Swiss-Prot record:
Its main location: membrane. Keywords: ATP-binding, Cell inner membrane, Cell membrane, Membrane, Nucleotide-binding, Translocase, Transport. One of its GO terms (cellular component) is membrane. This is Putrescine transport ATP-binding protein PotG. Its EC number is 7.6.2.16. InterPro entries: AAA+_ATPase, ABC_SmlMolc_Importer, ABC_transporter-like_ATP-bd, ABC_transporter-like_CS, Mo/tungstate-bd_C_term_dom, P-loop_NTPase, PotA-like, Transp-assoc_OB_typ2. It is a peripheral membrane protein. SMART domains: AAA. The keyword Membrane applies. It catalyses: putrescine(out) + ATP + H2O = putrescine(in) + ADP + phosphate + H(+). ATP binds at G52, A53, S54, G55, C56, G57, K58, S59. The gene is potG.
Amino acid sequence: MNDAIPRPQAKTRKALTPLLEIRNLTKSYDGQHAVDDVSLTIYKGEIFALLGASGCGKSTLLRMLAGFEQPSAGQIMLDGVDLSQVPPYLRPINMMFQSYALFPHMTVEQNIAFGLKQDKLPKAEIASRVNEMLGLVHMQEFAKRKPHQLSGGQRQRVALARSLAKRPKLLLLDEPMGALDKKLRDRMQLEVVDILERVGVTCVMVTHDQEEAMTMAGRIAIMNRGKFVQIGEPEEIYEHPTTRYSAEFIGSVNVFEGVLKERQEDGLVLDSPGLVHPLKVDADASVVDNVPVHVALRPEKIMLCEEPPANGCNFAVGEVIHIAYLGDLSVYHVRLKSGQMISAQLQNAHRHRKGLPTWGDEVRLCWEVDSCVVLTV
């Protein structure tokens, strides 16, 4: 498993300090593993995303971190302390739920102050922290309003302020943008990241939204059937997936099957049933004789070519079956001679670009050798 060091801002690997260590954590229900022997290290100040489809185990893992579920096996270490058997109210951890769970009868400032009052902090300290949080989330002028008088984005900021007011060592976010519309969600993702980075709190978030994870997190763990499929930075997971599952879960991808045909100095040549012409991949790809592999190719790596490439590029010929115009780009769905469907993306850089293929046209698709990622699992 690639437990890669995160991409820190103005930090070196030496400066990173582990905060949360998950050691062989398992949670079983009736003999079925919801979380299956996972291990992970998260560093101070890191924003980390657990990403996966419904039922993959990500929410169960988050609930174990919060203390709402007891592990069947394994340890949860926070700053060197084993929290596995510590009740939720004694953990230096706060959780922000998708529904925000604001008290409807309380004002904004009363909601933010609630946890501080439960901890019996002095009134002056409570007032100081509430004012600090109101300023942090830019909600000073809404301090006297109640939740029903706020927009969705404002309610989210209040919930975040309440979670940060107690100055937790670890903040947990459960589908933080799930209740927002797309435009507001896109804006709030950047706003929340900015707030978390200014505070410096370590954060673990759960989401099924790949764009949300890639926008907000420094590292991502893709989960499937209770296990980590791949851990890494967003760019690493997208450009260098280690399994077919992670390649298909993040973004769009074309997948070809192939078997090694020939080893050349500048690359490996594969026979692929989906392609008329041999498929060439990097020479250092992990390919064994007579063992089938999958080759992943992102749609944006494919070019439309008028003539066969002369520089050793891969190419295929097919018929345009459908075109999806998405504003900034168009997606061409092409049926190859073999019958396999692949998609190619073309940026709409010019408002009125002539000569582009349309439905029913025969097109030639080209892609570089290093655009192919060979997957053995």
